[in-house]
């Protein structure tokens, strides 16, 4: 019998059980999905049902909002904003992991916060850096933030990257990181983790639609010199990118490819690897699903799959291939 391997990013953490478990919609626990038997989808060393019972059948306290002082604001170009702010030490530690993100707002209205991936979290200085692409109403509001002023953030959240298990298990291996556009920002914590585990990392960057590679400051600290090239051409993986990927995985025995960009880039890379018959290479990628509450309640991050399955991707940790296979568009 086929059993899908999925995980909940919050399972076993201080935020579990959450509102989903309280309402009978737990991602992992069968009994907290309405069943009368114990059949967890993925055992994490903690019984979520028991934790809920011990907590009076109520969800644990969820993420808090913090008011933080902005230490630096840089407008890299008209639509790219870099913000550095001071955070509590525990929050800085929690946000140092690959895939970490927060919700930011500059307005008192809680409906105006926007999910932003962490570029860097310095646990020595407690300075957190984020890079924001100005696209719509919510992100335009962030242009009003000034150095020395304050911003309100909510976090920590950790499901900004799919395939985290594939990243963590890499040790003394050769890794390829492919990034495009604002995907340059969330790739930095991933590269940092890979370098810490003594992996050799090759980075390909397509700066489009930006004017420059604005994460050079952090790549230099990691002794990473990225190769710049055009990755997408007419909505498809460019011939230049195909040649580079085929050459690098052929000569360097690549064990993991991390894709930091839009879903079209992830999909095209997976399709090309299938064409090369290289399903043996592990994958990880950015989580590009829309998010609003970050707790799986609002439904903004949900997607429907074959078999009438609904997945809440602000919490569901899956492999990059799984987020496209069997996905329904209506």
Where are these regions (language model features)?
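Short acidic, glycine/serine/threonine-rich loops at helix termini
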Residues: 270, 296-297, 325-326
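OB/S1-fold single-stranded nucleic-acid-binding modules
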Residues: 2-4, 8-62
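Short Fe-S-cluster ligation motifs
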Residues: 6, 54-74, 314-330
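Local cysteine-cluster metal-coordination motifs and their immediate loop/turn environment
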Residues: 17-20, 24-41, 287-320
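Ferredoxin-reductase
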Residues: 55-152
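FNR/FR-type flavoprotein reductase catalytic core
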Residues: 137-292
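Short amphipathic beta-strand/extended segments with alternating polar/hydrophobic composition
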Residues: 114-119, 310-317, 324
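Short, surface-exposed secondary-structure boundary micro-motifs
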Residues: 107, 156-157, 306
